[in-house]
Regions:
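Glycan-processing catalytic domains of CAZymes
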Residues: 1-212
Length: 212
């Protein structure tokens, strides 16, 4: 991993790298697919991809804002029908669609890619993606099927999410901790709290239930 994004990013120290590698070996030994996204650019991306492949990961590099589709073809691009994570050879994470001025331009840009796995936000503006829109995104441009996943943060709450209550800005509930200085509008969540769990799952209005 790298401590900072960009072409001049410096690697983590050896102790940190070994700790992370030890954690990631556990799912690998259990036969699970492991995905790595490093915030790097330029020639560093190829290094990340090759390093990940050597370690048994599906690894890629990208901008930390996660707001663009790379202007390069996916690594190991293929026409396979991908229905399980163990079949995935490449992936794209795009969580911030602000560069796409219309809903259709956003969906069109995603549908014209050949990634085996797309990880996107449930919402564009203030409306969740519809069943028809998600079905559209489950097809690669080359005709193969792919997996579509929705991002959901468990460790942080955000004031732009539909569960947010305006009163929390002045007085945060006990399960809502300090703001994240690197991401305005985001707050650390005490993820073990039942009140936070109730917002995330278990009712028709809960975030995970909307995804499902």
């Amino acid at each position: 991993g790298y401590e900072e994004d960009g072409e001049k990013a410096e690697r983590n120290d050896a102790e940190t790298d070994e700790f992370l590698a030890a954690m990631l070996r556990k799912p690998l030994l259990a036969g699970k697919q492991v995905f790595i996204l490093d915030y790097v650019k330029g020639k560093k991306i190829r290094h990340v991809q090759e390093w990940g492949a050597a370690e048994g990961y599906i690894a890629d590099g990208g901008d930390r804002l996660l707001d663009v589709i790379p202007d390069r073809r996916p690594m190991n691009e293929n026409t396979n029908n991908v229905t399980q994570l163990k079949q995935v050879k490449n992936f794209l994470v795009l969580l911030n669609p602000e560069h796409y001025k219309t809903r259709e331009s956003y969906l069109k840009a995603l549908s014209e890619t050949n990634y085996d796995l797309l990880i996107v936000d449930l919402y564009y503006d203030d409306r969740p993606l519809s069943r028809e829109e998600t079905e559209r995104l489950k097809h690669k441009a080359n005709g193969g099927r792919r997996i579509l996943l929705s991002y959901m943060s468990v460790g942080e709450a955000a004031d732009y999410r539909p569960y947010w209550q305006s009163a929390w800005t002045a007085e945060r509930p006990h399960w809502l901790a300090e703001p994240n200085p690197e991401w305005p509008g985001s707050y650390k969540a005490r993820y073990w709290s039942k009140e936070w769990h109730d917002l995330l799952y278990g009712s028709p209005d809960a975030y995970l239930d909307k995804i499902m």
